[in-house]
Amino acid sequence: MGITEQIEEAKRSDSLLLLVFYADWSPHYEWIEPLVHEFKKRVNIVRVNIEVNRKVADTYEIEIAPSFVLQRKDKVLWEKTGKLFPGELRDVIEMFKSWDPYIRMD
């Protein structure tokens, strides 16, 4: 299954989707895999090599690796470019896992 199909399949569920945009040459590449491994049971994760999958990167307006996009269905909830610490990602995931977009805050 290709990257686009993986993203579309993940967007059909109610689960959070974390897109991890990377480049093999990036000096940050080495710490991305442990991060992905830690969170793969909590959210759907799709890794996107920005050089190989330029069309997907362009869709999300990604220019720099690493970049991260957290979304549910078609709604982008959070974005980050650059170094990402596990605690930071953990907090963001927990916040949005408990967030219900259908609750009105009047």
What are these regions (language model features)?
Residues V56-A65, Q71-L77:
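Structural alpha/beta surface segment adjacent to cysteine/selenocysteine redox centers
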Residues I3-A10, T59-E63, S67:
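Membrane-targeting and insertion segments and their boundary/processing signals
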